[in-house]
Structures are given as C-alpha cells and as structure tokens.
Amino acid sequence: MKIRFLLLIMLISYVSCTSDDKEEVLPRAYTILSLGDSYTIGQSVCETCHFPAQLKDSLVAKFPAADSFSLELIAQTGWTTTNLLNAVEGENLTNTYDLVTLLIGVNNQFQSKPFSLYEEEFPVLVAKAVELAKGDINNVVVVSIPDYAYTPFGQDYGYSPETSQEIDQYNNFASNYCNQNGITFVNITDITRQGLINTNLVSQDQLHPSELAYSLFVERLLPFAVEKIQ
C-alpha cells in the first residue's frame, strides 16, 4: 500500500513538473524582402504567381497556422544592378527581414552594360541584402539569372548562343562570389533553358517565365527558405 502511495506521489510530481516546463509558443510574424527585376515581380503572370509570392504561400503551408508571413518587393521590369541599388537606397527599409532574396543582372546583359559594372555592383547589392536581413548572411538567398534565349522572344530576335554564354558569365561570377562569402546561391537557369521544348514554362508574352516555371523555382528555393527562417 505504501509503495503504491509513493508511486502516485511521484507520478503527480512528474506531471506537475512537465506541465510547468512547457513554454507557451507564441505566433510569429515573418517578413520577406525580394529584390530584383521583371523576374521578381513576375512580368506577365498574376500577382500571386511570381516566385516570391509562391515562396511565401509555400512557407505559410509549412509553418504553424498561427504564424504569419508578409512579403515586400523592390523590383521593376528593366532594372539593372544600378537601378536596383538606387531604388534600395531610396527606400526607408529596416534591417529586420527574416529572409531576403536577390535576383538581378539580366538587364545588365541585355542592355550591353560593361561586365565590370556587374562585378562592381553585385557585391554591393549582396552586402545590402545581408544588412537588411538582420546582418545575417544565413538569411539571404541569391537566385541565378534565367536564360531568355530559350524563349520564342529570344529566338524571334535572333539571339545567338553568345546570349547564353554571357548569362553563364554573369551567373558564374555570382555563384563564385556567393560560395566564397558563405551566401546561399540557387541555380534555376536550367529550368528556363527548357522553354523551347516545354512551352508551358514561358508566359504569354513569350519572354518571361510562367507560373509553372516559377513553381519549379520555388521547389528549389523552399528547402533553403525553411531552414533559414526556422
């Protein structure tokens, strides 16, 4: 009888301790900032179809229902690294973002800007992205530049293999820089190079990625985003 009584006391004490040890989990509000150009705003697709919006929605599905996600874009069709730098500097941004994505450079190539300009300004943009991401390199993801040569637009305007070679040059520089500085770099260029054999990957303007293509971008981005935000 005495043994049963002691066991009961121990059980009650254990339950009491474990209950006290449980911490209340409060809902969290996460913020995402996406920097870039037409590939970021999703030219020719719906407002919820571009990759930042799809990434946000995918994160919502991965996290507790009480958590919330907000998304801010600083991007515009035609922007070069110079345009994006000026825009970021002109905004009153806080350095509190949980995740910052950066995709920039295609208009430097398309507008025949000196490659040295990208070599100079891309690192500045990465540093700014890190600063905005709470100063933490682990909160930043750089996305490779899509290849518009593999679209009807690219073919109709007679773009040669040199276009893809130049885009490779930009992406190789960005990838090497990110690898050397501990920044996550996600390659999605190969997805866009299927645009001629899978026309569903190209939007109605015959140039930019479609909603489907952006969903494939997100499949690659999501594991990194989840890891960084958790």
Where are these regions (language model features)?
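Serine-esterase "nucleophile elbow" of acetyl-processing enzymes
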Residues: 18-77, 89-95
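Basic, gly/Ser/Thr/Pro-rich low-complexity segments located predominantly at protein N termini
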Residues: 41, 47, 80-83, 110, ...
